[in-house]
From Swiss-Prot:
One Gene Ontology term from the biological process aspect of the record: neuron differentiation
InterPro entries in UniProt: ARM-like, ARM-type_fold, Armadillo, ARMC8/Vid28
UniProt organism field: Xenopus laevis
GO CC entries: cytoplasm; GID complex; nucleus; ubiquitin ligase complex
Keyword Nucleotidyltransferase: no
Annotated protein name in UniProt: Armadillo repeat-containing protein 8
Subcellular location: Nucleus; Cytoplasm
Keywords for the protein's UniProt record, in alphabetical order: Cytoplasm, Nucleus, Repeat
Function (record text): Component of the CTLH E3 ubiquitin-protein ligase complex that mediates ubiquitination and subsequent proteasomal degradation of target proteins.
Amino acid sequence: MACVLEPPLRMSVLSEVTASSRHYVDRLFDPDPQKVLQGVIDMKNAVIGNNKQKANLIVLGAVPRLLYLLQQETSSTELKTECAVVLGSLSMGTENNVKSLLDCNIIPALLQGLLSSDLQFIEACLRCLRTVFTSPVTPVELLYTDASVIPHLMLLLSRSIYAQEYICQIYAHCCKGPDHQTILFNHGVVQNIAHLLTSVSYKVRMQALKCFSVLAFDNPQVSMTLANVLVDGELLPQIFAKMLQRDKPIEMQLTAAKCLTYMCRAGSIRTDDNCIVLKTLPCLVRMCSKERLLEVRVEGAETLAYLIEPDVELQRIASITDHLISMLADYFKYPSSVSAITDIKRHQETGQPCIDPEEAEPRGTRDESQCTALSISHPVSQIQHDCLLTSEELDHDLKHAHELRQAAFKLYASLGANDEDIRKKIIEAEHMMDRIVNGLSETSVKVRLAAVRCLHSLSRSVQQLRTSFQDHAVWKPLMKVLQNAPDDILVVASSTLCNLLLEFSPSKEPILESGAVELLCSLTLSENPALRVNGIWALMNMAFQADQKIKSDILRGLSTEQLFQLLSDSDVNVLMKTLGLLRNLLSTRPHIDQIMSTHGKQIMQAVTFILEGEHNIEVKEQTLCILANIADGTTAKDLIMTNDDILQKIKYYVGHSNLKLQLAAMFCIANLTWNEEEGSQERQDKLREIGIVDILHKLSQSTDPNLCDKAKTALQQYFA
């Protein structure tokens, strides 16, 4: 059985391992069952808190033997239980240890152990399963491979408090998406764990609460069920709301707030409900304060960002709660550079006393998993002034620097999503634009993405585009981001660029000069529909009221082939933006005539293709507007008048039942019949021949005043 550590140990190390640890493994093979039991107990005592010993025993083959003893019918229940305990201890070591246990098929063996009638053995198996499943190297799908496992775990919930804690923890960690939510929901997880929220055990209450938070996330079905579940006469949202009280543990407040947030976003609680406005939102703002642990501040900010993201009223309330906008500035005060870390460590090594973390809490209160993982984080100011942290704890704090920046950017993005006044407050925060610009070049991809999202949110402000964005030349780092970034960053960055290319943005000119046309044209070739949309959208904004050179550059950059590929795109958003681009390209007479002289045949083919296709009203309206622009050209209108197929389509749509299409077709007719232009008489006669005038007479009696006026204006051209 392939049950070894990676990479393999050197021979010199292996001989040392053999000398010091072989006797523990040898005793597992003793013919006397009592000696085997004592050997397992001694092994248990040897590995607790000793990762080196754990690794040694795994290398020497202890795991297959322990699993064999655990599964043997002839093994006593006590021996099986002790084997499960040792395996659990081994799984609390390094990730390589867990990988080795998985290679030895530990999970099926432990799941089989759950069929036992002995409670202590069941609890030992569950404890080990909990540790294995919560390791980042364990595929959570292993919980769902055997369809009988979930219902059996549901039955075990009634066996003991420990069983409840471990099972809820397994569920919470292994529920990673809608498929898992559905499986757990269909097996009655909501009804089976709801009563655990009132358990006498704090750990059980917390694990049940965490389970509900992952079940409710982005799941309307589960959330609606939760909203109507009663426990001891109280609805679950009321129980969650009580857990938000300030006297409850921070972990409980935060997790309960997540439950209510997810239920609100899933639609089972209204955004104006008091439990959201007066309890959940203020609680999450409290979690962002600098008195909280770094992990709490990160989760609090990200959860609050998610809660308020779609609702402008919640954004306004959050922005004036506890000085949140200025509070978030502290999120950027944590060092993330090597030099800053070195400076702090050098300060720490100047002889000032540091407290051992194990001395900071009473003995006997932590299990092994707690002893081997630091769980306390302090503000940097405390590191610098009090020097209460060990180097290991300091590293633990510093790794959160990126997470803090990411969370702050996310929350700023949500706060500024809709309200101009809030955006102004955010941008006026000290060094805010500098922080965003710096965030665009962070080494962490997640921080860069969050910074771009924040920039995108703020770029919706006309005022800020004209002032702060120009003052800080935001377009420069944004263009750099667009040169080489993962798709998720490219999507948001290109959306931001669309806003910077609006006609009133001072950034438009320098962006054009920096070679943006080529970049945006390349985005339209992407397999990602969102990137194609944004690329063509930015080009559309670029072409609005642009000079002939820019329009020519766009057409040259896209190529005729690519332009018509976009016009036949399966994504309607891509099609709409491409039509918008064409409409902007064909916007003044000289430009219309110039473009139609070189691309007229292909454009007319595309227009015909779209008007004949199964497209929605908006697509056809936009296409008719392009025809109206072509009809406004001096020479370009001849391409319509010599195309009987197009003329019949204009006739069809001016008599259509949809008002938008009628009006768009009417613009075509008005431009073709305008009698002040050369050749108007011939065009009027041809339109009369195909029956357009008869339709105009009917439309002049329309109940819609706009359509009626347009029809009368067109008729007047015939009698002027």
